[in-house]
């Protein structure tokens, strides 16, 4: 017999009033009654069906004839193990204990719903062995799918005296009950209401004490099966204080490794992390949440790492995320953070050594706690994360960081502090800066509510000092701490803090201000980009880099954001960069003075530190505003130091890093960098390194070959583009009446000049490697017009050739004074009052003065 239909959802449990009404009678519902005879359904009449319970508490389905209400068409008792099937929306089919197949076809689906609710009520209260299932066709139309609405449920034994037989039967039942949602839900209800887990834990201790391995493995499989039920309430109940050790103890036994067991309890108990209160928690509920959070993570990441499927893993992760959100919310509204920050307010320590040691340890634990809280917040959405980080900054996060980086000697703790600040600035690079601005704005607004102009003032000194403090802390750590792990984290933090992308301050947008500036600088025919914001691009004095109050009050919102970023980076080059790049600014970059055994001696500088600094040089030159970064780099002779590192007695990794830095600056196609490096003969160490490795198949040779490849590629592109544009612009004039042909060669003349210079100066070295195709092309391109010196002179907009003198070591040296003065113009912005600046060496001052004199003579 098969009557296809569609199921309904399982009825929800009824309240007492509903149950009382159903227990008497249901409302009559119009139906047709069918009886199966000879494999055919016979219509026995139409009537009204009710569910009733008589005085003897026997339940019946009764159908009265529609035409003769006193005549009964059907009276079927709900008894035994009868299975009622709901098919489609309006059909109930069953076979009574006499073997008769009966079907009720309801006029409306609501009538069918009413009688199904009656059957559910009877099963729960009178006849527990009857059942009601829905039957629907499978998706492919072949066969049918059953789903239980109500029925008898077989449950595990909760007897305190468990044995192998009862455990094996329980495991079988638990696995079978996962096949239907109804059975699964009833089993979950049983687990939670009957303390079945406590029964299992109790027997586990007995089985372990009596060494019954079969029971131990059965218990482990039972607990894993309960975890697979994927029910939050079950998981949370397992990690409660009185159960967690028993649960992880049971899970130490695994049938995949029957001869060994894990030591989860030992880890949690003695050696593992314990719940430590740095600051006493007043909220007991929060303690419970924190413990649950850790224990669930321990289960997910350690105990069950090989066992969990995606559904279980995601559920535990969601629970942990919810608990972490509760913890973060509590920290923001309570006094806990205030009491924690107070640990770092005073510099005085307790007098007794024991109390002093405890206090110092408490401060270390406080840093660990903050780092854990910040890591927790990573899973929050962006708005909630920003809110929490701003709360930390306002509460006094910098007090903690200041202690960690200036007073704490444990490198592990300092790494945690660095990780904390990295996480914050990676989320929003200007969050700390903006918090200080917001707080200062609120103070000004409160103190002068009627002064409209005060609402637009910028707390430059306050916010700048905050930004400088963070950058200075990180720079000091990089220069002074020799821990490789800490250095890597600090460099990561500096890269994030100094990256211009996304420096809008609200954490929601992206405004690549510096990148745009560099793009304009590279694609404009002017000496400097059209990027002023109230500044004279040809003469920038960073020490006087600020707006007047009237200008500040008239800034549009976008301009305010742009100014904020410009102020941020100008402040960096003014105050932090001279310290951060100090080892590269000093005249002797290979050694430094240090105190050894009470005496001041020269020691070799840290090559690993120099690698980080050279990478940062490359970073600021390529990512920051060209005007700001170029002025600092050239005025402080940093490229000279980078070039020296290529030829010094340093590790190969540092030498190649310096080569890559020179290569990156060359690729910027910036005429000021090109002229500076040619005039200072900074390519000589590159060719020395090439000579050392010219016949070797190694990384150094490959790196320098790539250097040459870039040059000839750009020269070819220039020749191709120049030829095409020359044809297109022949006889054309610009808006000012100037012949366009005169500007055809402006785009890539830097590389053609460089190629000719290298061929003229280091041709002998290059000819030793003519087997490399692009080196041969360099020679051919550089020597094409070699006899005609005017071509080389005109390519740099001048009339005099670059004089090249051979030094005793076989490498050429150039003289800046031999270059046409008109070609030099300004290698950087105007320089004012630099004689007394401690960051400028004598050579740098002499170089600047010579350039200024040449400019003055023109």
Swiss-Prot record:
Residues 1-23, 441-463 are annotated as: Disordered. Gene3D superfamilies: Pleckstrin-homology domain (PH domain)/Phosphotyrosine-binding domain (PTB). Residues 1-13 have a biased composition (Low complexity). Signal peptide: none annotated. It is found in: Nucleus. The keyword DNA-binding does not apply. Residues 441-453 have a biased composition (Basic and acidic residues). GO terms for molecular function: protein phosphatase activator activity; protein phosphatase regulator activity. One of its GO terms (cellular component) is nucleus. The keyword Nucleus applies. This is Serine/threonine-protein phosphatase 4 regulatory subunit 3. The gene is PSY2.
